[in-house]
């Protein structure tokens, strides 16, 4: 069984939008009340409470406050679950010695989703029925693909001025036919990916492409008066640009991952610590724009659902070592290390000559096969010496 998230666009009327926003506002107030309740109990009596203890307060709150009564009971219980998860994450970070980040109160407009964990929703032919204010509300939806499988949860999310519904469904595994091919991937900034067979995936640079337009919209927004009509219009333009960048990046990452999963049975990637790499102020913006972490997460998810294997290896020295003979320029006895500006690999020992990123991708593939698939051949992706061989063009 596999769990998927199916996302659809909702088109609520003005009245339905008001009801959704009122529900979000009520859930925000309940969330803040639960956080304050935990803090108050600990400060006064040194007592730690769990989500089940706090959920027992909801029946009384429903009697005292009509706004709380209008919210479905399953949605209220999910609010308590979110508070509990926030505190659990806080204590986990404290125990690990990380910066803890105490759970904060949600400001107005900062609570953007509600979840029906078990009941309170129904999917129609072109509508989604949600239980709000004590009765079902039929909201028009664009169901661009059928909801196949067992629906476990339903989440309604506000994204700017748009509304979406997300269904978590369980489906039977649909594995792709077995594929013997193996490939190594080297993430970069000049090219988004370099493959061990000599192919490249261009870096689209979505943020860089719209950076000037984004800066112009930001300057225009700062010149408007707060809480004015002009400020709301400027915010709308700014959010649309960010949404466009996000959607383009999301589409590119998913399509690239899907093509790789369809072609290869074993995919070797680098285990990059992107958070530390962002400390380089010269490359931080480009690294963030490349979205390597998102790509690896999507690739792993698609590989699992297709019965493919993704192997992450330590990227240390993969760009320095020669993929043909293993020669490493350690800086001693004239062995000059390659700089970041050196984009071509030439080995003084075996005379191997190839692109620097392709050389790294071959080393990544060899590390993955040596550690996890001993005795497995490279199936035409690389030769026995580890040098790239010709392969069909990989176009995206």
Feature annotation, model-predicted:
Residues 124, 159-160, 196-199, 325, ...:
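Short acidic-glycine loop/turn motifs at beta-strand connectors
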Residues 3, 285-286, 290-396:
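Positively charged, low-complexity nucleic-acid-binding target-recognition regions
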Residues 40-66, 148-153, 158-296, 374-396:
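Substrate-contacting helices/loops that form the catalytic groove of nucleic-acid
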Residues 34, 79-90, 358-368:
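Stable alpha-helical structural segments in soluble proteins, enriched in small hydrophobic residues
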Residues 121-132, 191-195, 343-346:
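Short polybasic amphipathic segments
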Residues 52-157:
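Acidic carboxylate diad motif detector
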Residues 1-76:
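Gly/serine-rich nucleotide phosphate-binding loop at the start of the catalytic core
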